[in-house]
Each structure stands twice: as structure tokens, then as C-alpha cells.
């Protein structure tokens, strides 16, 4: 449990009862956050969880107003590239890049948590000329990782427009937990 979790919903009575027993034993003050979901629409459909689960294994993650981030974990580091795609505003190219980068910063922090990615992370945001915009994106990324229980350190934007950061490895990444390497490919292919 973290402070940003308001509630946990479980849609099956016996699972709810087991979770409640567990919480009463381990964290009794949080049992009031546990609820039995009784809606007609399945819980996973209501909150689009299947879509989120499917998306978590994809390399490219679409952003809400267009654009995307591309996540490439390697043995050495995690490279994340921000692409503008169809994202447009009526403002200047600089302002458009700034707005997209702000959106991307929030999604990058979210994806790092969801995928359990750690180590060195290099974020290649869309180039911005204005110093105040570069600092604004750094601030947005710092604010977005505050919810993360993993320790993070974010450096200032490099002369190449990259924001380097580190994120504590709490457990093996989702990719390493779900997939196994194919021996015939010498580690370049994966099987789920």
C-alpha cells in the first residue's frame, strides 16, 4: 500500500474474504480500503485492464493526444524515445514539443513502474530550445516519479537534449519475469 491507493476492489467473494483476512493480520488500519465490487460490468472491462496488460508488453506506447514513447530495454540501459506522431497544437513548434514532452514525462514514470524497469534510463525527449521548457520537463518527470517507491535520481537535460536518470531495481523487470530466452537465438528472441 502507498498513500496514493484509495481503494482496492475485488470482484469475487472468496478472494475478497482472503484479502480481508490478510489485511487484518498485516495492515489492519487499511482494511477499510478493501471493497467487494458488485457492478454488472466486469471489473477488468470497466477499468480497461486487459488493454493495459496487453500494452505493457508493447515497445511503443501511444500518448493520449497523439505521439508516443518507444521503450527499448537493453542489458546496459533503458532507452526511451519520445515521438510526436500526430500530436499537434495551434501553438509554435516549441510549445507543441513542450506540451508533448510534459505528457510523455508522466507516461514514462508510469511505464517504468508498471514494467519494473530499473538501472540507467536515458530519455530522448523532443528537442526544445527554451531553457524554461527544458527545466519544466525535468520538473514534470521529477514530480511524476514521486509516487514511485523505487529510488530515482534525475539529472539535468544534457547538451544533446537527453534526460538521464537512474531507478532502483526492486525486482526483476516484467519482461524477465514473463518471458524466457530462446536458446536457438542466443538471447535475441523471447517466448511468453
Regions found by a protein language model. Give the residues of each.
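OB-fold/S1-family RNA-binding modules
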Residues: 1-69, 74, 159, 177-192
Amino acid at each position: 500500500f502507498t498513500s496514493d491507493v484509495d481503494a482496492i476492489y475485488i470482484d469475487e467473494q472468496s478472494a475478497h474474504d482472503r484479502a480481508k483476512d490478510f489485511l487484518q493480520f498485516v495492515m489492519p488500519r487499511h482494511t477499510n480500503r478493501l471493497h467487494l465490487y458488485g457492478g454488472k460490468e466486469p471489473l477488468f472491462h470497466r477499468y480497461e485492464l486487459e488493454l493495459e496488460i496487453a500494452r505493457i508488453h508493447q515497445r511503443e506506447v501511444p500518448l493520449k493526444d497523439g505521439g508516443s514513447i518507444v521503450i527499448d530495454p537493453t542489458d546496459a540501459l533503458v532507452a526511451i524515445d519520445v515521438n510526436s506522431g500526430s500530436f499537434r497544437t495551434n501553438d509554435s513548434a516549441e510549445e507543441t514539443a513542450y506540451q508533448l514532452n510534459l505528457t510523455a514525462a508522466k507516461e514514462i514514470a508510469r511505464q517504468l513502474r508498471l514494467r519494473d524497469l530499473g538501472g540507467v534510463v536515458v530519455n530522448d525527449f523532443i528537442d526544445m530550445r527554451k531553457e524554461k521548457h527544458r527545466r519544466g520537463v525535468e520538473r514534470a518527470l521529477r514530480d511524476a516519479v514521486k509516487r514511485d517507491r523505487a529510488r530515482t535520481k534525475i539529472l539535468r537535460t544534457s547538451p544533446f537534449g537527453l534526460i538521464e536518470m537512474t531507478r532502483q531495481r526492486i525486482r526483476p523487470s516484467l519482461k524477465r519475469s514473463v518471458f524466457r530466452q530462446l536458446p536457438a537465438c542466443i538471447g535475441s528472441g523471447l517466448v511468453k
